[in-house]
Amino acid sequence: MVLVTDLDASLDFYCNKLGLVETNRKEFEAGRFTLVFLAAPGNLDSAKATRSPELELTYNWDPEDYDGGRNFGHLAYYVDDIYATCQRLMDAGVTINRPPRDGRMAFVRSPDNISIELLQEGDAQAPAEPWASMENTGSW
């Protein structure tokens, strides 16, 4: 579960930019929070049948600061093409904090500053530009 501060910005990032799909949403008016469940496109059948693997976003309606790592450490996802994924994210305005210089791994951050690790499915791709010479940006 990841606590988010802006549900719309988080859904834009996780769905429109990262490519996850919303599988379920529950509003809890009495508790004043919303749960949104997301899955990778390749895991939709499993997510709908067994609710796994899914990412749960929790949005508390009343503003709250999540300091001291209360919202999470980092998430990791396998992707079919690390270079194409990073290019798509950059084109969507996402900063690549740790570029995939090795053709295997990259890091980005969500709107709530959650570190997202992207891993190449299968063998690493051959190092390629512009990634091989791209510097780190910020931290991950």
Language-model region placement:
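Core segments of cupin and vicinal oxygen chelate
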Residues: 1-52
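Short, well-ordered beta-strand elements within core beta-sheets of diverse protein domains
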Residues: 2, 75-77
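Vicinal oxygen chelate
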Residues: 23-26, 34-37, 77, 83-140
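Short glycine/serine/proline-enriched coil/turn segments at secondary-structure junctions
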Residues: 29-30, 65-67
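Short, charged, solvent-exposed linker or helix-capping segments at domain edges/interfaces
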Residues: 46-54, 68-69, 88, 119, ...
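Amide-forming acyltransferase catalytic core, primarily the GNAT-like/NAT-type
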Residues: 60-63
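Eukaryotic phosphotyrosine signaling hubs
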Residues: 70-74
